[in-house]
Amino acid sequence: MDNQLSDSSDDESPTDDCSDEGEVEHLKDELSQIPFCELQDLKDKIGSKKYNLAIHGIMEERTQGIPDLETKKKKNKGPQELSSKQRVPKLRKVVQVKKKMGRDPRFDDLSGKFNEDLFRKSYSFVNDIRVEEKKSVEKELKKTKNAEKRKNLNDLLKVMNQQERSRKSAEAKRESKKKIKETERELVQKGKKPFYLRKSELKKLELAEKYKELKSKGKLQKYLTKRRKKTASKDRRHVPERRQVDQ
C-alpha cells in the first residue's frame, strides 16, 4: 500500500512540474500585453511565486535556504539574532583606541611662547644667504646676453629688492616700537602712569623716523615727489569725467 502511494506520488511529481512550466510559459505570453494594474490583480490571484516565475524568471526555491542579512526577531518577542551567513568585518575593533592626532611642535603650547627677538637672532644667517643670492643674480645678469633670460633675471632682482625693502621697513617698525616701550617702561619705574600709544600716533612716529632716515641719505625729496604723484593719481580717479555735450 505504502509502495503504491510512493509510486503514485513519484508519478505525479514530474507531471506537476511539467504543468507548472507550461503554465509559466503561457503566462509569459499573455502578461506582456497586460497593463500594470491588471498585473497587480493577477499577482494577488495566482500568488507571488508563480507571478515572479512568469515575469522575472526568479526561482524562489533557490533562495529559500539563504537567510536575510538583516536582523530578525522571534515571534515570541525574543532577542534579535544575526544570520550565520553574514560576513565578518576584516578589522574588528575589540578595544576602542584613541585616535592619534598629528602634532606640530612649532605651534604647540608645550613648546613655550614665541620669542620674536630670539627667532630673528637664531635665523639671522638667512639674511646673509639672501644677500649672497642677490649678488649671484646681479653677476649672472651682467654676463647674460639672452633677452628672455635677462628679463627673467631682472624680474627676480626686482622681487628680491622689494622683499628686502619690506624686511627693512618691518625691522624699522619693530625698533621704533621697542624704543617706545623701553621709554615708557623707564617712565613707569619713575612713577608715571602707563600710557599706550594709539595706532595713528604710532604711525606718525614711524613716518617721522622714516623721513629722518631718508633725509640722512639724501633721498627725502625724491620720496616726497613720488608720494605726491601717487596721491594725485588717487584723487584723479575719484574726480568725475567731464561730459561732452553735442552742439
UniProtKB/Swiss-Prot annotation:
Main subcellular location: nucleus
Annotated Acidic residues bias: 8-23
Region (Disordered): 1-29, 62-89, 136-188, 218-247
Alphabetically ordered keywords of this record: Nucleus, Ribosome biogenesis, rRNA processing
Annotated compartments: Nucleus, Nucleolus
InterPro entries hit by this protein: RRP36 (IPR009292)
Bias type Basic residues, positions: 218-240
Residue ranges, compositional bias (Basic and acidic residues): 136-153, 164-174
Single GO BP term: maturation of SSU-rRNA from tricistronic rRNA transcript (SSU-rRNA, 5.8S rRNA, LSU-rRNA)
Function: Involved in the early processing steps of the pre-rRNA in the maturation pathway leading to the 18S rRNA.
Family under the similarity heading: Belongs to the RRP36 family.
Name by which UniProt lists this protein: Ribosomal RNA processing protein 36 homolog
Record organism: Nematostella vectensis (Starlet sea anemone)
